[in-house]
Amino acid sequence: EVSSVSTSQVLPDNATYTFEQQTKEIQAPQLWHPNHPALYKVISSLYHGQELIDRYETAFGFRWFEWTADRGFFLNGEHLYFKGANVHQDHAGWGDAVTETGMRRDIRLVKEAGFDLIRGSHYPHSPAFSQTCDEIGMLFWAENAFWGIGGHKGDGYWNASAYPVNESDRAEFENSVKAQLKELIHIHRNHPSIIVWSMSNEPFFTAPETIDPMRKLLEETVKLSKQLDPTRPAAVGGAQRPLGEKRIDKLGDIAGYNGDGSYIPEFQQPG
């Protein structure tokens, strides 16, 4: 046991109370790193008198990181040049109904191939996915479900506009995107493997008349992400379009340039 804290509170029936607890400072903790993924565990126990009513375990890790525009990424003071892979949460024969064993197998294979970063393409993944990244030492780019699929045809097509063309659909769509971002951060925030929250993937695959509201939604989700978790940067994934004054790569802290994005002169090459 590294540290413990106990708080008591008398509550009336059916009352709700939030406990705010802080342990003493932990001296020289082992730092989480892909090469040595040290993890700790918080055990939260709820008692009624001497009777244990509930118990919940939360794994977490200590690490610090820094993203820089000119020197790249640093983890615990060490410069890392990412060797990353896009990984979807699906399997042949299973589709999206992937077992946790299947997820762990995929992550182990990526690790054994020499990679150190996974981009969770292109939606929130299962907590088991993040947990496995923690346990085996895999950095994780966690992404929200706001993405274009290669075009901007009308509703009902596989490559429909990333942002709704019909104004009557927009409020519900935006609420859904923001709700999923909130859930993503609340569910996965304690995972040390996660070093960035991504707002999107290629949302520029949208109808021309929706470019402005698409950009506005990105700005709002970036702001929301920072409110919910100021410790991690907010990224715009798949930000290689559009060019000019409508570009989206500068709306967040970090931008991902997919496909030909690294060859477009307007974009700075990675550090």
PLM features per residue range, with description:
Residues 107-110, 117-271:
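Substrate-binding/catalytic cleft of secreted carbohydrate-active enzymes
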Residues 1-132, 136-140, 180, 195-196, ...:
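Secreted/periplasmic carbohydrate-active enzymes, especially glycoside hydrolases
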